[in-house]
A protein has these predicted regions:
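HotDog/MaoC-like acyl-thioester-processing domains
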Residues: 81-83, 87-130
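Catalytic strand-loop segment that frames the active site of acyl-thioester-processing enzymes
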Residues: 11-40
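A generic structural signal for short beta-strands and their flanking turns/coil linkers
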Residues: 9-11, 20-22, 67-73, 84, ...
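Hydrophobic residues in beta-strands and at strand termini
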Residues: 26-28, 77, 124
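Compact, glycine-rich, soluble single-domain proteins
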Residues: 38-51, 55
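N-proximal, solvent-exposed amphipathic alpha-helical segments enriched in charged/polar residues
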Residues: 1-6
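Hydrophobic beta-strand-centered segment that forms part of the acyl-chain substrate-binding groove
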Residues: 55-87, 92
Length: 130
């Protein structure tokens, strides 16, 4: 699915399926550093990683023919993103016929210490009625 989104390829997003979940990984890359003194990941890279993780999660689990369209994205930065691999998991809170709400958590050391959390709302292809 990464080939469908050039930005995903640019920042290096990887995805692994773990049963009914997807684990997204953003490998440490010097190209993704925003503050070279710390060094710390650029906040926009973290946001883009989380938004794409949510969109790809929906793409996989809804079987939609195309990438869902973002309606709204709200992100809370909780800790600095260090220069190391970053991981994310998504949870669909609600999915209707036209809109889906997704929660995203990103971490580096352990899921118990997230570096950011986000909520995303997507317009999805209207699902056929039974």
């Amino acid at each position: 699915k990464r080939q469908l989104v050039p930005y995903a390829r640019l920042i290096g997003i990887e995805c692994t399926r773990l049963g009914d979940e997807l684990l997204f990984r953003l490998p440490a890359s010097k190209d993704n550093i925003g503050n070279p003194i710390l060094p710390a990941l650029h906040g926009g890279v973290i946001a883009g990683f989380m938004e794409l993780a949510a969109a790809l999660h929906l793409l996989v689990f809804t079987g939609a023919p195309g990438l869902p369209k973002i309606i709204d994205f709200s992100l809370d930065y909780l800790r600095a993103g260090q220069f190391r691999d970053t991981y994310a998991k998504c949870q669909v809170w609600r999915q209707g016929r036209r809109v889906a709400n997704v929660a995203i958590t990103a971490w580096q050391s352990t899921p118990a210490e997230p570096i950011a959390t986000a909520r995303a709302h997507f317009k999805i292809e209207e699902l056929a009625r039974p």
